[in-house]
């Protein structure tokens, strides 16, 4: 069970959480200096003049300030769902707040699911562009090494994904310190060049950004598509709130991450003012020649850590989507006996790996991948801002004017960045959108298919109480032990019970009819886990409640019934499940291609017994057919 102290962390605990947040939360945004400023001036779209450099630096500073410091750190971190963050947590919060408005709720659900789907597109681009940009330092060290950039990147990524099944428990403790060293190095690299040209600090004034946009509106608009790269990974501040808490995340941002990023960007700008020819790779050009290879190694470590944080998030988001009914059950392996959150999902791991390899081979450089990156990031930002509005309005009950004031400005900023990236869809933006569209189709097809299945089963269902009354008019033979029948719908007779009576003609001494419910809250404590109703004749109707971050462990939950009149012996308990075979039919439910897709997903889903942590040697599965 997840437990969280209500007291904010202080002292050594706060320091440890802050250092942990540096490694996990800020890995992605911390590697942006590798490619963000380089990409703004790439392809000769923007001339490298002092006015343009000042304007771009000012845009970078105020983009970091508005989107990260104001929007995420000060506003969105307040929209927690029982202490948890992330798009799924916000989706659950917003949809619960508007449950009295079914049309609006459905639209929000679709929007939230699309945002979650786009996250997987973002998850493909982030490791690809991060590791590529780090390894591209080899080109600066020795131009002849250019041909090794893609192969070395693929080797690093292959090792990273192959290591996932072992978990990160052992090496995870080094993520924070290594990333902290990375941020210190970012600041040191920048300081050297700022000292040489301190006039660059004038770009802290927003008037340079405004003047740049006023004097060169077309150029400024195009530049926004690359400037947004400086805030990639900002959504991790909210997504990882449940792991570290608001205070450590805010402290890490204002005390280390934001200053280091700004110093590094200004250092790159100061160098470009003096040596415009370094624009090809300003990050690595800042380093003295003797430090290049150590810097490449450190950058590669930092990008691997950033990628690891995203892979872990992908596992977590997938598990939450499964429990909320938007994805079929997948095999989930726990990689730590101490931390329930440390999981490994093989299907997601190798699916991500295949798409990332495809991205690296197809695009071949961080510069080409940058065109694909922005659209995924800005789409998620827009969706998060939209969801925040509905949380403020319907969950916090703030007046309309205040809600619009709180989110309207951020929505306009996000929309501007989104529009600047939308013009790059044909240049690569299609890639994460295609992945997102595929994931969205899978998720909505699964949700709709499960709904159709439930409707069909409900139509054919027999009321459990009435059925038991008829059975006990002429009672069958009772055998020793306890039978646990898993039922999708509370109060309906499980098909497994019907088949058991039909073929075996016996009933156990004790019978539990168990329905597992996943709720739109992250955590449900043990005290609210079980609801039990006696049906007579040593039969009980049991409802088990889980949050979308709880571990759905049925035997552990049923053990709570021992003090409530039910005698459970693990070695005398059998679990009966219905294994439904889905038949697609023309003229009902969904389009036939979606029904066939759903059938395939259903057929290949992991067994319910594994997902619910049932002991495999005590499970009996009985099949039935369902037409949708």
From Swiss-Prot:
InterPro entries: K+_transporter, K_trans_C, K_trans_N, Kup. The keyword Membrane applies. It catalyses: K(+)(in) + H(+)(in) = K(+)(out) + H(+)(out). GO terms for cellular component: plasma membrane. Keywords: Cell inner membrane, Cell membrane, Ion transport, Membrane, Potassium, Potassium transport, Symport, Transmembrane, Transmembrane helix, Transport. It is found in: Cell inner membrane. Transport of potassium into the cell. Likely operates as a K(+):H(+) symporter. GO terms for molecular function: potassium ion transmembrane transporter activity; symporter activity. Belongs to the HAK/KUP transporter (TC 2.A.72) family. This is Probable potassium transport system protein Kup. Its main location: membrane. It is a multi-pass membrane protein. The gene is kup. The keyword Transport applies. The chain crosses the membrane at residues 56-76, 109-129, 141-161, 174-194, 209-229, 253-273, 295-315, 343-363, 372-392, 400-420, 425-445.
């Amino acid at each position: 069970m997840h437990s969280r102290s209500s007291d904010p962390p202080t002292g050594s605990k706060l320091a440890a959480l802050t250092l942990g947040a540096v490694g996990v939360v800020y890995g992605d945004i911390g590697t942006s200096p590798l490619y963000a400023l380089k990409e703004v001036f790439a392809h000769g779209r923007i001339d490298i003049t002092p006015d343009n450099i000042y304007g771009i630096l000012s845009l970078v500073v105020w983009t970091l300030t508005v989107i990260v410091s104001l929007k995420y750190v000060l506003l969105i971190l307040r929209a927690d769902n029982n202490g948890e963050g992330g798009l799924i947590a916000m989706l659950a919060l917003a949809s619960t707040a508007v449950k009295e408005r079914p049309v609006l709720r459905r639209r929000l659900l679709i929007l939230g699911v699309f945002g979650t789907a786009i996250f997987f597109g973002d998850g493909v681009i982030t490791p690809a562009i991060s590791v590529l940009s780090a390894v591209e330092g080899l080109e600066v060290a020795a131009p002849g090494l250019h041909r090794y950039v893609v192969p070395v990147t693929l080797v690093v990524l292959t090792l990273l994904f192959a290591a996932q099944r072992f978990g990160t428990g052992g090496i995870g403790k080094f993520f924070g310190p290594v990333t902290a060293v990375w941020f210190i190095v970012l600041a040191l690299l920048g300081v050297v060049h700022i000292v040489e040209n301190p006039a660059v600090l004038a770009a802290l004034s927003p008037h340079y950004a405004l003047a740049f946009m006023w004097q060169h509106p077309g150029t400024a608009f195009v530049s926004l598509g690359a400037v947004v790269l400086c805030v990639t990974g900002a959504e991790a501040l909210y997504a990882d709130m449940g792991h570290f808490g608001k205070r450590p995340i805010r402290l890490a941002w204002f005390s280390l991450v934001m200053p280091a990023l700004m110093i590094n960007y200004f250092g790159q700008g100061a160098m470009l003012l003096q040596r415009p020819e370094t624009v090809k790779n300003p990050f690595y050009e800042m380093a003295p020649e003797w430090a290049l290879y150590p810097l490449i190694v450190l950058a590669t470590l930092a990008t691997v850590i950033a990628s690891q944080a995203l892979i872990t998030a992908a596992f977590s988001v997938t598990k939450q989507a499964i429990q909320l009914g938007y994805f079929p059950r997948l095999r989930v392996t726990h990689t730590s006996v101490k931390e329930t959150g440390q999981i490994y999902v093989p299907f997601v791991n190798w699916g991500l790996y295949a798409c990332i390899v495809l991205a690296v081979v197809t695009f071949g450089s961080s510069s080409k991948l940058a065109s694909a990156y922005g659209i995924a990031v800005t789409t998620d930002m827009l969706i998060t801002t939209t969801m925040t509005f509905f949380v403020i309005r319907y969950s916090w009950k703030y007046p309309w004017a205040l809600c619009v004031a709180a989110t309207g400005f951020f929505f306009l900023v996000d929309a501007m960045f989104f529009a600047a990236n939308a013009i790059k869809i044909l240049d690569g933006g299609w890639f994460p959108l295609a992945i997102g569209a595929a994931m969205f189709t899978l998720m909505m097809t699964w949700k709709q298919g499960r709904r159709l299945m439930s409707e069909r089963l409900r139509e054919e269902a027999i009321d459990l109480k009435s059925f038991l009354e008829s059975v006990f008019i002429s009672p069958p033979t009772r055998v020793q032990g306890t039978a646990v029948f898993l039922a999708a719908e509370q109060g309906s007779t499980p098909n497994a019970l019907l088949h058991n009576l039909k073929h075996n003609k016996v009933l156990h001494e004790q019978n539990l009819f168990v329905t597992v419910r996943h709720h739109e809250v992250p955590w449900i404590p043990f005290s609210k886990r079980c609801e039990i109703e006696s049906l007579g004749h040593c039969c009980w109707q049991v409802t088990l409640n889980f949050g979308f971050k709880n571990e759905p462990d049925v035997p552990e939950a049923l053990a709570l019934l021992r003090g409530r009149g039910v005698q459970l012996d693990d070695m005398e308990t059998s679990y009966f499940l219905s294994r439904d075979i889905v038949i697609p039919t023309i003229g009902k439910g969904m389009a036939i291609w979606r029904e066939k897709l759903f059938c395939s997903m259903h057929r290949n889903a992991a067994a319910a017994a594994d997902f619910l942590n049932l002991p495999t040697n005590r499970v009996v599965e009985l099949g039935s057919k369902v037409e949708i």
